[in-house]
Structure formats: C-alpha cells, structure tokens
Amino acid sequence: MVLLFGAATLIALALQTMLPYWLPIGPYVPDLVLILAVDLGLRHHGAIAALMAFVMGYAIDAFSGTQIGLNAFMITLVFLLTYEMSSRLLVTNVVVGILAVFAGVLIKDLGSIAISSGFGGLGQRGLMADLFGQAAITALIAPLVFLALARSKKLLGLLTPGRREDNTPARRWLK
C-alpha cells in the first residue's frame, strides 16, 4: 500500500505541475494529491495512513517551494477530517468521496490562505470563485482517481476481503 500511494503521489505531483503547461486551465488545476489523501481517510485507517498523508503533503511542499510544512499540515488535516467522517458513517461510497474532496479542497485552500497571508485575503470575490471552481473540478475528477486506485489495489492484490475497500458481490452497497 505504501508503494502504491507513493507512486500515485509522484504521478499526481507530476500531473499537477505539468497540466497548466499542457492545457489553458489557469487556476483550475485539480488537486490530485488531496484526492489521494481523501481516499486514504475513507478506506485506510491507521497510523501508516496518517503518516502517508503527512508525507504526501510534505512532498507538495518540497515541489512547490512555499512555506515548508503548510501543505503537510493541511493535507493531514483533510485526511483526519475524512477519517473521522468515514468512521461515523455506515457507508462510504463515491458520492461521499466526491463531497469529501470538494470540502477538502475548500478547507485546504482557505486554510492555507488564512495561515500564509492572514484572514484579509479571504474576502476577495475573484479568489473565492477560483477556489470553488478548483474544488468543483477536483470533485469531478475524484471518481476517476478512486477507480484507478481501486483497480490498482485489486491488480496488486492489496484488497483484503471484508474491508471497506472490498467490492465483492456481498458488499455491493460500496459501489
């Protein structure tokens, strides 16, 4: 599992870095690493998953060159909130994942802005429109990333029967 999410994080970081050069999408670059953190929070509970979320956030910090630790903190916070939400719900399906990704992007970006530039930067109307646009695009891409992760886990034999991520016929409600 660690190697799968490590490779997925590197691919996500490469795509997030290159997408603005390939496509004219401006500020609407999907946050693929956050989708991975939400998947960790929904389906993998334990200290290793929390450590992986922190390392994924720290990798964003290393690639972006911004304040070291800010993205690590925000990605870990989104992971913990998603973990708490999934432990309280009976069913964690794609719709719950999409909503968690949308809220996670808003929490991460608003928290990063509030910490790095103070709360005065949150009142700009154009900024809020861009944040909601990025959250919507990231939420729309989330099911594809969840599907790719589930197929990769199945291909590598990482699914254990009876777990939340198991999609056997006896557990059809998870689709």
Give residue spans per PLM region.
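Terminal, non-globular segments
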Residues: 1-175
